[in-house]
Amino acid sequence: LEDTMLYLDSADTLRLVGIRGGDKDNVITKTAQAEVLTTGNGAQFQEVFEQMSAMYRRMYADADPGMKIVLEKTAVNKTESAISSPGTRKVCFILSQIPYGVQYMEKGGVRQSLNLGKVETTDKALTAVLGLRGNTPDQIQVLADRVSCFIVGTGGTPDIGDAYPSWPEKKNSALLDMMTKSYEDEYGISPEVLVIHGGLECGLIIE
């Protein structure tokens, strides 16, 4: 969504009225919407939007063939509630540059990641909720410090809530030994044992 807004604001004519996306902090958001005010030519804005929409459909034709970018016009005047053009650019900067995705890998597997789960504007303030994940408590803490540094650097206030528990590899596991032996007895070969970066409930069950 932020890339869409940046594209449409190439002439600095866009002002953000409101933005909303996602409903869970640990889920990659599938939909988002923004209400904007343009101070430029409406017909030209529509043309630029169509060009941008076609570009993104080409870019994500294989990865997301069902992608939809919809533009709806409204006759309601919301000039008074719109964020300034510089403020709109700042929101776009924050959403496009905030740490996101895989942050650290080891032995071919992901060990540290985060996602932007929810975002919304309320009373001209931007609220973003991120889900942090790490295989160890230290990895989660480092990630929290990094995100906090970014938020403070962009004029925001970080609020670190309860984190999902980490799920470090347990090298001495009676259950793993039993499952490995059962697999070897059944198939005559040793199983490939991996630590995956997923299933947050695993950490909750351990605790």
Describe every region a protein language model picked out.
Residues 1-133:
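Midchain, well-structured core segments that form catalytic/ion-binding scaffolds
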Residues 3-11, 48-59, 146-154, 174, ...:
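Generic non-transmembrane alpha-helical segments
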Residues 28-33, 63, 130, 142-146, ...:
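General "foldedness" signal
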Residues 70-115, 120-123, 137-142, 157-207:
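An extended, acidic, His-containing surface patch that forms the Zn2+-binding/catalytic region
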Residues 129-155:
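C-terminal, non-catalytic macromolecule-binding modules
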